[in-house]
């Protein structure tokens, strides 16, 4: 029986490379679970594999949005579930690869999203316009510290959505999410790459510097000029892209943009670790070892 394999873990831990190796060995196809790799043209700053690095492995949910569009977990879930089931119908193994926490959970769990209420949302959006995203995020933290811990304090859309759900349900945002001890959808095996700060932090620094050496600034300039990328968009708030946009606006030097990208990535990694460590279904693999051999051993292949 074919069942999916998920490869999760923090940024820069080697998920994409392991995903390719598993797909090559298990006749698989990759389903992207990185919310920023959904965007066309956001390549260098998201460490998206090049066509050559994909080694002929089909990739799904990659380059499906323009940078002016808003990524939606609910829409992603609907489309990615269809991709996974279509892959299995052809006798192939879906390899789910990424570290976007809510997107991972939407795919491996049968998450029924809470309803929306236009009046409630409008009230919170008015509050956002009145006090700004930073103070609104502080209000979320006061109401639901766990929700605030997984939502960036510069993400107005998700902050508003969390407050809307809390008001509509009368419960913490987490209560609307499926439990992490339930059997994963399709019997998915979830593999996690375990990292230490001493090992991962230098990789984050190296990767960030290489991004800029390989033309990250020019990538962002092109997205602004040719595709309408703006700082207020979902894509424009991505780590790295937000900092470069600030540099292009004269609010940061390029060196400051590099350093803030590094610190922003480290902060995001801490949230990823906290999130994934709470999921006891994950089979952990040390990222600094032979991850392919260990993964195949866990899978009994």
Swiss-Prot record:
Alphabetized UniProt keyword annotations: ATP-binding, Magnesium, Nucleotide-binding, Transferase, tRNA processing
Residue numbers binding ATP: 9-16
Residues the entry annotates as binding substrate: 11-16
Cofactors required: Mg(2+)
EC number from the UniProt entry: 2.5.1.75
Catalytic activity: adenosine(37) in tRNA + dimethylallyl diphosphate = N(6)-dimethylallyladenosine(37) in tRNA + diphosphate
Highest taxon, organism lineage: Bacteria
Recorded GO MF terms: ATP binding; tRNA dimethylallyltransferase activity
GO biological process: tRNA modification
Gene3D superfamilies reported in the protein's UniProt record: 1.10.20.140, P-loop containing nucleotide triphosphate hydrolases
Site (Interaction with substrate tRNA): 100, 121
Database matches in InterPro entries: Dimethylallyltransferase, IPT, P-loop_NTPase
Annotated spans, Interaction with substrate tRNA: 34-37
PANTHER family the record matches: TRNA DIMETHYLALLYLTRANSFERASE (PTHR11088:SF60)
Similarity comment: family membership: Belongs to the IPP transferase family.
Function according to Swiss-Prot or TrEMBL: Catalyzes the transfer of a dimethylallyl group onto the adenine at position 37 in tRNAs that read codons beginning with uridine, leading to the formation of N6-(dimethylallyl)adenosine (i(6)A).
Subunit structure: Monomer.
Protein known as: tRNA dimethylallyltransferase
Organism expressing this protein natively: Corynebacterium efficiens (strain DSM 44549 / YS-314 / AJ 12310 / JCM 11189 / NBRC 100395)
């Amino acid at each position: 029986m074919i069942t999916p394999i998920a490869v999760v873990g923090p940024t820069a831990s080697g998920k994409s490379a392991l995903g390719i190796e598993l797909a090559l060995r298990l006749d698989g196809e990759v389903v992207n679970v990185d919310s920023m790799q959904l965007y066309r043209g956001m390549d260098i700053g998201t460490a998206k594999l090049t066509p050559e690095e994909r080694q002929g492995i089909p990739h799904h949910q990659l380059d499906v949005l323009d940078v002016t569009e808003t990524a939606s977990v609910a829409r992603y879930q609907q489309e990615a579930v269809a991709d996974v089931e279509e892959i299995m119908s052809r006798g192939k193994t879906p390899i789910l690869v990424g570290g976007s926490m809510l997107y991972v959970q939407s795919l491996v769990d049968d998450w029924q999203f809470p309803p929306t209420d236009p009046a409630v949302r409008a009230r919170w959006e008015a509050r956002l316009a009145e006090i700004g995203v930073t103070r609104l995020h502080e209000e979320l933290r006061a109401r639901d510290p766990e929700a605030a811990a997984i939502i960036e304090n510069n993400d107005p859309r998700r902050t508003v959505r969390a407050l809307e759900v809390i008001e509509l349900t009368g419960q913490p945002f987490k209560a609307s999410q499926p439990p992490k001890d339930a059997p994963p959808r399709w019997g998915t095996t979830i593999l996690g790459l375990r990292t230490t700060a001493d090992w991962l932090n230098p990789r984050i620094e190296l990767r960030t510097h290489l991004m800029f050496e390989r033309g990250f600034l020019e990538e962002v300039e092109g997205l602004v000029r040719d595709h309408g990328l703006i700082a207020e968009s979902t894509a424009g708030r991505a780590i790295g892209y937000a900092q470069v946009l600030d540099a292009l606006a004269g609010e940061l030097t390029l060196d400051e943009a590099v350093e803030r990208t590094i610190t922003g990535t480290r902060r995001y990694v801490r949230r990823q670790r906290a999130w994934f460590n709470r999921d006891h279904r994950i089979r952990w693999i040390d990222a600094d070892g032979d991850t392919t051999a260990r993964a195949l051993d866990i899978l009994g292949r």
